[in-house]
Amino acid sequence: NAYTSFEETVYMLEIPADNKEILQKALLILHDWACAVSFEDEEVEKEKGVILEEWRSRQQSLSGRQMEKVLPFFLKDSRFEHRMPIGDMDVIQNISKERVVDFYKKWYKPEIMSVIAIGDISTSVLETEIKNILGTVPASEEKLELPTYSVPFNQTKDTCSFVDPEFQNTILNVY
């Protein structure tokens, strides 16, 4: 499973804690995501379809429509105000494979990745396997200085309303 937010993409694998072989396979998957993704034309086009379908699905859901309306209100005057994590569908539909590869090379770097393991597992086994498998991820040739984006604190009184025929109740929130 995975998700993308404004500042990160997180991949999650749920595996049994007591099976070393499965642990190794899971770490190999993480390794491949980190440095060995293949960008075959057909796969890039397929992934575009997945993103477009996720976007369509969000547009058809009440929570998705609400998020599209409310998030820009909360993120007013920030870089995120008009940039949903899923991206601009015109860009997604028309992006070239080369631009996708450039993005991957820029942002998928070991120095800005973390592996977090949670569960009842031997830390010595886990640490050894992480070092053995993920230790082979090559260091970046070009270092990346991570940008920082702030969301200004809104000190004015403001309101946001969201009306949708699917809403069965009236909800009032104060933030």
Name what the model sees in each region:
Residues N1-E21, S57-I112, T136-Y175:
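Non-catalytic beta-strand/loop surface segments
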Residues L13-E47:
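M16/insulysin-pitrilysin zinc metalloprotease superfamily fold
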Residues A17-K20, G119-S124:
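Helix N-cap motif at beta-to-alpha junctions
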Residues E54:
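Active-site neighborhoods of enzyme catalytic cores
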